[in-house]
Amino acid sequence: MGKTAIFIFTIINRILKEEIKGDLACLVLCHTRELAYQISKETRRFCKGFTEEINKNMRTILLIGGDNEKDQIKDLKKKPKIIIGTPGRILSLTKKNNVLNLNNIQIFVIDECDKMLNALGKFKIFKNFKLYYILYI
């Protein structure tokens, strides 16, 4: 939980200080569904202590294979600040018109990047990012 807490608190802090503008602020990419689920669960737990208004502005969604894609598309329409997901599902949703646009992501976290680098080689979805912060965990 230590490294997860560090990068999640950093993301939350930057969003709260309004250093990050726009709807979608952060993408956390994980090499497994289980890891993505764990990080999503921890992020929601960390945000529970905030007021309802802050919690609403800190909307987090989980985009992983095996979950209902139509439900995930509905969640994306609610304009999340943080997306946590796996490369396959992220790629799938970026290929659908007007579903997921990653051009304005300002923080991109690759969790367990040593295991992720091989997977990223297979996906060419992150080529035109304007990133202000990149955290390799």
For the regions a protein language model found, what residue spans apply to each?
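Walker A/P-loop
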Residues: 1-11
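Conserved protein kinase catalytic domain
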Residues: 12, 44, 126-130
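SF2 helicase catalytic motif II
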Residues: 90, 94-132
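Conserved nucleic-acid-binding Ia/Ib motif block in the N-terminal RecA-like helicase ATPase lobe
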Residues: 20-96, 104-107
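Conserved helicase ATPase motor motifs in RecA-like P-loop NTPase domains
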Residues: 1, 27-33, 110-116, 130-137
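Short coil/turn segments at secondary-structure boundaries
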Residues: 8-9, 40-41, 75, 121-122
